[in-house]
Each structure stands twice: as structure tokens, then as C-alpha cells.
UniProtKB/Swiss-Prot annotation:
It comes from Mus musculus. Residues 1-62, 305-341, 393-414, 498-553 are cytoplasmic. Residues 52-62 are annotated as: Interaction with phosphoinositides. GO terms for cellular component: autophagosome membrane; cytoplasm; early endosome membrane; late endosome membrane; plasma membrane; stereocilium membrane. The record marks 305 as: Interaction with phosphoinositides. Residues 84-283, 363-371, 436-443, 465-475 are extracellular. It is found in: Early endosome membrane; Late endosome membrane; Cytoplasmic vesicle, Autophagosome membrane; Cell projection, Stereocilium membrane. This is Mucolipin-3. N-glycosylated.
């Protein structure tokens, strides 16, 4: 039989490179030595970074990179957020300015109520918008301009959509309608010097048949440059605004709603020059973004390597357990080798890398995908901060939240599935029955938002008070509907949900005091009594452990 000390040393020296092969014909002593080697290998795998340092002197590179990455990604997000705020503010302020410029008598927060009720008001509104468009250069306080198409400037398109044929006689309760929709359009050039008079004198040659009319649309394009970014050491962007003023008569109710939609696109300015050091600052920011990408790549490689090693060790342990004990490893034990925190960090690294590349392209004015970039960077930063919880979980006093969430998650998911069925039932019922009589129930999305607010105790009285009383039956139903929903979800479902979390929390606290239930995997590892600083985990080429370590317990 081989010398036991030699066999142990051989297995220990190569335990991170290739697995020790187990043969059923091995002698009992060799089998015990192989079991001991497997236990040490598993115990080292599940150690925290501090214990691994004491076991083999391995530096916690992943932890150091995560700390560095948190600082860098957060700084990057803040800088991009400030830039994105200027972009969003410029869009919103221009949209408000256009509404005041092109909608006659418009006042702030009138979007839902802005409408006209007479034919003369419709003509007045159209003529007012056209006149303002033709005089834009003289009246606008912004740097707005017409879009140039070659030597000419883009025109305003006025289109009306109407039924092909229609004879409507409400007095006789008769009508003859052809639902086929036709469209007529004509253009108004910015360089036209024509005078637009009163509706009876207007030279637009626009005639509307209000009985057949569906919509009138005024569409035109304007351009502007966001100069406020210069003060923040950034290159300005050029904006294209596609404006559409819509007169909506689809309901034929005597009320024509007017709305202004602004479709905004950001483009790279063609010919620009800025004095000063703005371009140099842009280069510094791109260098910083490149450093963020390199840091995330290092984190990605280290975490991916750890995940792969975990899968390899999982397969090795499954084979070992099957050959040695003639038993299969349970699925829960196999899942312990898959570190979900590493997978989350890998996802955050990928999002950060893609977002940083987009940010660099935006700074170079090659792309203008601010919204996509903000979603990527925002999500990645959130995941980076969540990933740090893993390292706090190594301390018994800080991992209570993590353990509670992990233990409660399966029951919470099952509970939420059942509660969601009741919630959706109330959503559909409220939308169908109360939608015509209550503004908060006009769409499924608004119904869901309203009911979720009620669960949290928000806006209860106004939800009751705003219910129209035109139909006593529906009003009575609304009371039964709202009272039953509030009672069911607040006093029963929400209380049960909180009790579910509380029960799990108490169970975890009990486990921390008396010990957690041990699985087959943990029982197998627990038979290894070697401490991390015993020296038995060290490989032949490992450096001696430093006596100075902040992780010493």
C-alpha cells in the first residue's frame, strides 16, 4: 500500500488543478484519504475571502475590484445623470414653449381640457398655428429654426382625415356613411408672405365638413441647439423637433380636443467650434469610461472563472458521491455550487460595459441614445451595490436580511401568485364596470395603479369621492367593490404577507441561535475539522500567509 503521508501530500498539491481519481478497488486507507482530500477541497470552496487568505494566502482580488468598481460606476452614473437631466429638461421646456407658441390661449396643465366647440374656433386655431409658424423667427425667444432641405426650408403639412361619404340627419334618426377614410393634404411654405385673415377671408383655401371630419393634423419640423451643455464642459447637441398639432373629432360629440405631440431626435452637429478646454475634458471623460470598462472586464473574468470552477467542483462531487456512497446528490445541494451573487455581478458587468461604450459614443457625438444608456448604467449600478451585500453576508450580524429573503422567497412567490389572481380579477372588473364613470378606472394600467395605491392606503377618499352618481346601480356597486377590495387586501392578504415574512425572520433567528439544519453536503464537509490557518489547505507553490490581515478573527 502507498505511504499515506505521500498520498495526502500528492492529492493536496494538485487539488486545484485536477481532481484526485477515486477507484472502487482502492484500499480503505486510500479511500479515507481521498474523502479527506475532497472534504478539504469543498470546505475551501465555501470559505469566505478572509478564510481563503488564511488557508492559502490568496488575496481577495474580487472583493477589491468590487469596492473599486462601486466607486467608479457610481461616479460615472452621477456624471451621466447630470448630463441626461439637461437633455430631458431641454426636451420638456421646448415642448411647453411650442404649446404656448402654437396653441391659441393655451395655459399650463390644460392638456386634458384643451378643446374647441365651434367651427369658427377650429378655423381660428388653425390660422393661429400657421401664422405663428410663418412668424417663428420674429416671435420665438429660443434658437429655433426651420429645417433646411437643400435651398428650401421645410413646409408645414396640413392634412384632414374624413369619411369618404356621409349624410347624417340626427333629427330624423337617419344616416348614410361610408367608413372608408380619405386624406387631403396641402403645404404651407415658410417663405410665403401671404396674410391670413379671418376665417371667412383666410387664404388657406381650407374647407372642413365637420359631419364627416375625423381629424385635422398640422405637422412641421423645427431645429434647435442645446447650448446649456457648454457651461457644464460638454459639447452641445443638435435637436430635431417633429411637431404634430391634432384636432380630434372622432367622437363627433361637439367637442374637438386639441393636442400637440413633439417627437424629438438628437443628432450630431455638422459644423461646430467651441473655444476653451471642452474638447480636452471630453477626452478625460472617455479615458475614465475606458478605465471603468477595463475594471468591469477584470471583474467579469474573475467571477466567470469562479462560476466555472464551481460547476467543475459540483460535477466532481456528484461523481465522487455516486461512486463512494452509491447515492445521488440532491438538487438543493448541487445548487449550492452555483453562486447567484457571481451571476448577478457578471450581469452588472456586462450592462456596465455596454452602457459605458454607449456613453463614450454619446460623448463623441456618434450616438444620442440617452435613454438606453441611462437604463443600462442605472440597472448596472443597482446590481453592483446589491452585489456588495454578498460580502456583508459573511458576517453573522449582517446576513440576517439575506438569509430571511432567501428562505422566504419560495413561499412569497407562491403567495404572490395566488394574490395576483384575486388582484387581476378586481382589475378587470373595475375597468369594465367603473371605467365609464371614474377617471381612475379608464384603462387597465390606471386601474392597477389605483388599486395598488389603495393597498398602500393612498388616496382612498378621492377614489370614493370622484365616483360619478349618474347611475345609482353602478355607484352602489362601486361601494361594494372598493370596500371589499380594501378589506380583503389590507386586512387579510397584506397581513398574511407580513406574517409570512415575520415567521421566516423568527425561524432564521432561531436557527442562528441553535444551528441551521444540515444538508448532506454540509454534513460531509463538517467532518473536516481543519481550521483555515492550519496550513493543511496550502499548495506547494503557495506563499506563506501574512501575519498582517484585517480579516483575522
Amino acid at each position: 500500500m502507498a505511504n499515506p503521508e505521500v498520498l495526502v501530500s500528492s492529492c493536496r498539491a494538485r487539488q486545484d488543478e485536477s481532481p484526485c481519481t477515486f477507484h472502487p478497488s482502492s484500499s480503505p486507507s486510500e479511500q479515507l484519504l481521498l474523502e479527506d482530500q475532497m472534504r478539504r477541497k469543498l470546505k475551501f470552496f465555501f470559505m469566505n475571502p478572509c478564510e481563503k487568505f488564511w488557508a492559502r494566502g490568496r488575496k481577495p482580488w474580487k472583493l477589491a475590484i468590487q469596492i473599486l468598481k462601486i466607486a467608479m460606476v457610481t461616479i460615472q452614473l452621477v456624471l451621466f445623470g447630470l448630463s441626461n437631466q439637461m437633455v430631458v429638461a431641454f426636451k420638456e421646456e421646448n415642448t411647453i414653449a411650442f404649446k404656448h407658441l402654437f396653441l391659441k390661449g393655451y395655459m399650463d396643465r390644460m392638456d386634458d381640457t384643451y378643446a374647441v366647440y365651434t367651427q369658427s374656433e377650429v378655423y381660428d386655431q388653425i390660422i393661429f398655428a400657421v401664422t405663428q409658424y410663418l412668424q417663428l423667427q420674429n416671435i420665438s425667444v429660443g434658437n429655433h429654426a426651420y429645417e433646411n432641405k437643400g435651398t428650401k426650408q421645410s413646409a408645414m403639412a396640413i392634412c384632414q382625415h374624413f369619411y369618404r361619404q356621409g349624410t347624417i340627419c340626427p333629427g330624423n334618426d337617419t344616416f348614410d356613411i361610408d367608413p372608408e377614410v380619405e386624406t387631403e393634404c396641402f403645404l404651407v411654405e415658410p417663405d410665403e408672405a401671404s396674410h391670413l385673415g379671418t376665417p371667412g377671408e383666410n387664404k388657406l383655401n381650407l374647407s372642413l365638413d365637420f359631419h364627416r371630419l375625423l381629424t385635422v393634423e398640422l405637422q412641421f419640423k423645427l431645429k434647435a441647439i442645446n447650448l446649456q451643455t457648454v457651461r457644464h464642459q460638454e459639447l452641445p447637441d443638435c435637436y430635431d423637433f417633429t411637431l404634430t398639432i391634432t384636432f380630434d373629432n372622432k367622437a363627433h360629440s361637439g367637442r374637438i380636443k386639441i393636442s400637440l405631440d413633439n417627437d424629438i431626435s438628437i443628432k450630431e452637429c455638422k459644423d461646430w467650434h467651441v473655444s476653451g478646454s471642452i474638447q480636452k475634458n471630453t477626452h478625460y471623460m472617455m479615458i475614465f469610461d475606458a478605465f471603468v470598462i477595463l475594471t468591469c472586464l477584470a471583474s467579469l473574468v474573475l467571477c466567470a472563472r469562479s462560476v466555472i470552477r464551481g460547476l467543475q467542483l459540483q460535477q466532481e462531487f456528484v461523481n465522487f458521491f455516486l461512486l463512494h456512497y452509491k447515492k445521488e446528490v440532491s438538487a438543493s445541494d448541487q445548487m449550492e455550487f452555483i453562486n447567484g451573487w457571481y451571476i448577478m455581478i457578471i450581469i452588472s458587468d456586462i450592462l456596465t460595459i455596454v452602457g459605458s461604450v454607449l456613453k463614450m459614443e454619446i460623448q463623441a457625438k456618434s450616438l444620442t441614445s440617452y435613454d438606453v444608456c441611462s437604463i443600462l448604467l442605472g440597472t448596472s449600478t443597482m446590481l453592483v451595490w446589491l452585489g456588495v451585500i454578498r460580502y456583508l453576508g459573511f458576517f453573522a450580524k449582517y446576513n440576517l436580511l439575506i438569509l430571511t429573503l432567501q428562505a422566504a422567497l419560495p413561499n412569497v412567490m407562491r403567495f404572490c401568485c395566488c394574490a395576483a389572481m384575486i388582484y387581476l380579477g378586481y382589475c378587470f372588473c373595475g375597468w369594465i364596470v367603473l371605467g365609464p364613470y371614474h377617471e381612475k378606472f379608464r384603462s387597465l394600467n390606471r386601474v392597477s395603479e389605483c388599486l395598488f395605491s389603495l393597498i398602500n392606503g393612498d388616496d382612498m377618499f378621492s377614489t370614493f369621492a370622484k365616483m360619478q352618481q349618474k347611475s345609482y346601480l353602478v355607484w352602489l356597486f362601486s361601494r361594494v367593490y372598493l370596500y371589499s377590495f380594501i378589506s380583503l387586501f389590507i386586512y387579510m392578504i397584506l397581513s398574511l404577507f407580513i406574517a409570512l415574512i415575520t415567521d421566516t425572520y423568527e425561524t432564521i433567528k432561531h436557527y442562528q441561535q441553535d444551528g441551521f439544519p444540515e444538508t448532506e453536503l454540509r454534513k460531509f464537509i463538517a467532518e473536516c475539522k481543519d481550521l483555515p490557518n492550519s496550513g493543511k489547505y496550502r499548495l506547494e507553490d503557495d506563499p506563506p500567509g501574512s501575519l498582517l490581515c484585517c480579516c483575522k478573527k
